[in-house]
Amino acid sequence: VAAPAELTDEALAALSDPAVLLERAWTLEPWGRYAERSAILDALERLLETGGVAPPPPGRDWRLELLAERAIDLGREFKIDQAHALVDEVTRSANPDHEIALARAMLASGQALAWVGTDEATRQAHRAFADAAERFAAIGQPDWQGSALLRRGYSASYQHGDLVGAEELIREAIDTYPPDSMRLPGALVSYADVLIDLGEFDRADAEIDRALALTDRVGIAKVRVDLTWARARIAAGRGDARATERLVREAEREAIGMDWFKTHIGRSYLLESAELLDLVGVSDQAQRYFERGRDHGVEDNGDVAQTMAVLRARSGDPGLALEQLQELARGDWLEKRVVWRHTLLTAWATFRAGRDGAGELAARAFEQAVACGTIRVAQAGEPDITAALAPLAERAGSPVARELLLAGRGLIVRLFGTPAVVAPDGSEVRLPPGMPGELVRLLALHEHGLPLEVVLETFFPDVAPEVARQRLRQVLTRLRATAGDIVVRDGETLRLIPAWVDVREFFAAGNRVRGARGSRAVRLAYAALALHSGPLLPSDPYAGWAEDSRERVRYRHLVLLDQVAADAAARGSHQEALTALEAALEEDQNAEERRAAMNRHLQALRAQPAAT
């Protein structure tokens, strides 16, 4: 399918048939050639003002159809009040048989209402889009019908946080479009967007491949850019930093020949690129894209504030992040589909700032993500932070977080702070005092269990083997009577049933820091610190079997605290650095370098101007 040829000014001026001009405007829409479309509508307006135009056929009204198209374009540009005014004029003036004008006006109304974002406006948007789809079906316009379903799914469901409803409606739109529709590739892009948010990366890849095949045939440049951008989002969700950076740059190159960077679309692209690159730890490039988006020549700076809050909450100054996140929450409208992320980032900044309440906030964020469709929404959108906050949310009573930690396992075991064993239903597994509980804690340190001889030597070092085995059987009997079969014997090995154990997760999280870079390394360091909720095994202070683990935990804990303190100091985040250094000093009282660093940060804080 060839793209519509561009019209010269002379050719445009020569067009004198309103039907031809409207047809041209409709044709340009799926190609994203909005400047040309606007020029066509301007030409139609001038033609109608000069008069001398032949009367329209029955059921058509050139002026009302022009107003409906203008309303559609205004809605796309977020000029909501102006779009509503034109829609009202069309609906007041149209006769019932002006089907095209009324149907297109309903499409514009749905879009404008969806941008308002309130629950009531969203309900009205659903009704307007449904009305438009029915009208388009009645006049035999499946292409427009598909567009009404698509916009209902994307603007009224997806942006309002109903991802499951969005998937269903956009799937219906795709099935409604004729196979040769120019709008079908764009619909597949929107479908991929929803699947990406749902964490369905493989399915999204398949839809992108299908859209790419159609795009290669029809050559719509805008869709090609959108497809590349969707692949960048998938790469970021999978944690592939190299692919993310490459695809972001590729999308930018493809967009240069278009008018993206002359509009709000260009600003959004730059800011979202900054967020994606920061997500995978490409900090320097993330900062460059943010600065370009911040300096973009558009008056509204709400998007800039949102991205700045995201970057700061993830790995910048947590105090400033909390201030910005609170300011955004007090604003006119935070898009419903990202409310969960706003709450999650608030929880993360709260934790990093050393304040109380992070677990409760994370639990709320998880519930909000589930309300969008599934907890995979959070896992796909903020994978590191979701994983990091899950233990805090579980301690705050979140059943969603508990399921995340268990991942099909039979127990949650906490050895930091007050030891606790939690069953899949959230109830506490009470352990008998003495050796039965100590045995559980010992085995919890060793994912694959311990040889029976090691257990016997640990608990009964000076007892004859047969007597030791008899006593161990008594310990296991007491344990089984109270806690059930949570310890099993495999041949000559004793082990705990599959369990999530905080100290094992702490070591694994610390190991992940080593392979990361930039801002992501700092996030992963904080993620490991989130698991350290107190001294290791305080209930077994004299147990020799715990000494090695205690020393390893102490060393790793100090390394992580020093890492986040150094990063905070480099960014001038003095309170954040001070919080980390104070925690390190509790572990190591003799570190003079840390005391000196704390004094420097205290002096810097005193030198800061007081807030007004």
Q: Can you describe what each PLM-predicted range is?
A:
Residues 249, 253-254, 266-285, 291-394, ...:
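Alpha-helical solenoid repeat scaffolds used for protein-protein interaction
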Residues 1-95, 112-127, 156-164, 197-202, ...:
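Inter-helical turn/loop elements of alpha-helical hairpins
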Residues 427-459, 479, 557:
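Short amphipathic alpha-helical recognition elements used for nucleic-acid or partner binding
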Residues 387, 391-416:
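Intrinsically disordered or compositionally simple regulatory linkers and C-terminal tails
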Residues 18-34, 62-79, 101-119, 144-161, ...:
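Tandem amphipathic alpha-helical repeat scaffolds
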Residues 8-9, 42-54, 87-96, 129-141, ...:
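Amphipathic alpha-helical segments of tetratricopeptide repeats
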